[in-house]
From Swiss-Prot:
Gene: secA
Protein name per Swiss-Prot or TrEMBL: Protein translocase subunit SecA
UniProt subcellular location: Cell inner membrane; Cytoplasm
UniProt organism field: Burkholderia pseudomallei (strain 1106a)
InterPro entries associated with the record: Helicase_ATP-bd (IPR014001), Helicase_C-like (IPR001650), P-loop_NTPase (IPR027417), SEC_C_motif (IPR004027), SecA (IPR000185), SecA_CS (IPR020937), SecA_DEAD (IPR011115), SecA_motor_DEAD (IPR014018)
Residues noted as binding Zn(2+) in the record, renumbered to the chain: 915, 917, 926-927
SUBUNIT field: Monomer and homodimer. Part of the essential Sec protein translocation apparatus which comprises SecA, SecYEG and auxiliary proteins SecDF-YajC and YidC.
PANTHER family on file: CHLOROPLAST PROTEIN-TRANSPORTING ATPASE (PTHR30612:SF0), SECA INNER MEMBRANE COMPONENT OF SEC PROTEIN SECRETION SYSTEM (PTHR30612)
Amino acid sequence: MTTGFLQKIFGSRNQRLVKQYQKTVAAINALETQIETLTDDQLRGKTGEFRQRIAAGESLDKLLPEAFAVCREASRRVLKMRHFDVQMIGGMVLHYGKIAEMRTGEGKTLVATLAAYLNALAGRGVHVVTVNDYLAQRDAEWMGRLYNFLGLSVGINLSGMEHDQKQAAYAADITYGTNNEFGFDYLRDNMVYETDSRVQRPLNFAVVDEVDSILIDEARTPLIISGQAEDHTELYVRMNALPPLLERQIGEEKADGTGVEKPGDYTLDEKGRQVFLTESGHEKAERMLAEWGLIGDGESLYAPQNITLMHHVYAALRAHTLFHRDQHYVVQNDEVIIVDEFTGRLMPGRRWSDGLHQAVEAKEHVKIQSENQTLASITFQNYFRMYAKLSGMTGTADTEAYEFNEIYGLETVVIPTNRPPKRIDKQDQIYKTAKERYDAVIRDIRECHERGQPVLVGTTSIENSELLSHLLKQAGLPHEVLNAKQHAREAAIVAEAGRPKRITIATNMAGRGTDIVLGGNVEKQAAFIEADESIPADEKARRIQQLHDEWETLHEQVKTAGGLHIIGTERHESRRIDNQLRGRAGRQGDPGSSRFYLSLEDPLLRIFAGDRVRAIMDRLKMPEGEAIEAGIVTRSIESAQRKVEARNFDIRKQLLEYDDVSNDQRKVIYQQRNELLEAHDIAETIGAMRHGVISEVVRQFVPAGSIEEQWDLPELEETLRNDWQLDLAIQEMVNESSSINADEILDAVTTAADEHYEAKVALVGRESFSAFERSIMLQTLDRLWREHLAALDHLRQGIHLRGYAQKNPKQEYKREAFELFAAMLDAVKQEVTRIVMNVQIQSPEQLEEAAEQIEEQGGQLGNVEFQHADFAAAAAAATAGGAVVADATAEMVSHAMSHSGPAGEVPRVGRNDPCPCGSGKKYKHCHGKLN
């Protein structure tokens, strides 16, 4: 109450910021007359003048009014577009490292030019980040004319580009590209063996377009560079036969034994998107696997040697029960292709990890591709937080303002619209069944069609869009379908979606980034005529003028009919995505309307609000085909959406806290790699490692401060001779001296190791040997880091079980991850020292040969893939307390269970050994009981 009273007097934080920025806009407008008098060359010369002033110490903030005025004038001359005052405010918000929420059609692409131009003057690079290659290329070419006019260079960073093209793109003043490609380039730069192979400069300033999609929707899914691991193709095929033999249990058993409506072998948690075997399910699965010869008779799935089988059982179950064709994926050209749950786009090249993708391939009887081992990974959360300054734009950020601030430290500023919005958002209509809902949707579409009003119908899946398309065909209504299967025609369909009587069905936000103009997009049609060289210039001008005249007529016709009408056939989990769909109508003060049609069979209502709404309908004795249209119901649905949003935020926050652990370690490893790449000579580093390793070896047999009776000299001599190529008569040395102590023995061995090393260097020369050392160091670091990533995945999947032992899973994860990291760094020192001490060389040629052999044995894996793993299934593993993260991260990266090498081995456990689950109990009293 007090807050509301104070806001009335002083205004909200947002209002105060906008008022503050309006003062700067007044200063920019005051410069406009003066800037307009400049010639093109004088205007272009301003860029050089600004750069000199920055070099002399002037701040970007002080330059802002002049730079913005210059950019606006250049845009007016080159693009024939003058920035509105509200766009100037948007540019300031971006420059100050905040998020600008601007309504659809308010010109976000043009707004980005202001902040990009100003920050590019400093010469440290600006990245403009978009959601797909099409938008990156379109915006770079479109806005590039403005930047080039002002003397700035523009680069485009697309997937599949050559190395030198990428370097040139990043060297440009302003670089356009996709979030995936910027992230992958960062990871690739930290896998190179030469400094010249890197493409990125230090991360300076990023403007993220559709910031909510990139920093929130995709925040939970890491970018992964992976290589092929061990092949388990046959196992996936065998396991695919299991789920059809199992029956679903309806209802959960309560403490008093009630609650199960129909007994079965597995339970499905739709809210959490998880599947669990029941006791009878375990028994049946074990019986079937024993029959197929995959486990021994009477063996448990929980026996340590069968843990990998357990992973395959659950992967097959989830593939059959949680992932559905044409909703979560499509099958094209003998491949399973993921459908993005947020945009409805196809994502070729991306794969679910943790064996799930292979299980789906087995289910669909297509070619099963091998599992992958993670070589490098990073989440968008951690990648974008590395920029010195980060900002973003979107049409819908206010609902997620808390998360932007909490995770990224980004404040959201709602920018006023240039013209007051005229869109009418009608009350939701809720029906009992999906059939009744679709009947109502068809009626609404027919009415709009008859009065010449264009309609955009939003659906949540390809399956629903094709069902609606079928119903429209039956009703004799011509329409276009915009889903992942029509991806290639997307821009053309969106361009024409605003024409009279046009009906367009779109999955989620497919087509985002392209405005729907009432009357159709005349610019697109004009561009085709302009590009046709066979048409004479005067004929071109006549045809383009004719197009504009026709468009004016159509534009007025659509406005009279009520503008674009948006129909939502289902509420999304997030209010933000609903708002994005609504936001396609009513751009720049145009008329428009929106309405959502829901049914009690929709997942959101069924899981979160169905019982309450059904009770209201029953109480009101609603006849079939009659809808509820009441504020109380709409509020109930929004409350359900808020619950889902809060839950997803908690998952993202938890994931970030876990990922921060590996992120800190990643920073250390990548910093070490960069230092190694840039160092002229690493002899000092190698020497420190050697001394540390030799000291550890000697102390095993001759402890510090010990007496002669405690020494094991024969064993020390043998170890030094066999493992380190040091043939020392230490026993003889001790016999000849009456007062030698443990420290003197260590000094003698260290000196011998130094001499052995120097002798090798002398044979081939310092420069050649230093290059060999660098190569060995990088290869060893990369190989052990890969194994460490696999071990962390392993650890993360089981860490939630510590909650049952009254331990904090998060703290346990941090502690054990640190121990694993320390062990990995020790292993790097041991391995590098062992190779350097043991290598036998006589010439520089032999040295190169040795480096190549080591690279073949432990270098990068083959068939490297770049994935942005889908998180749809994993996002929901929200079980109680600390259990959230373990399941939630199950899909995040391919885990180590099936990998070869130490990280993937599951050792046999003795009955009296601690149980591998981490409970602290003996194996025989814990999981051993199940055997």
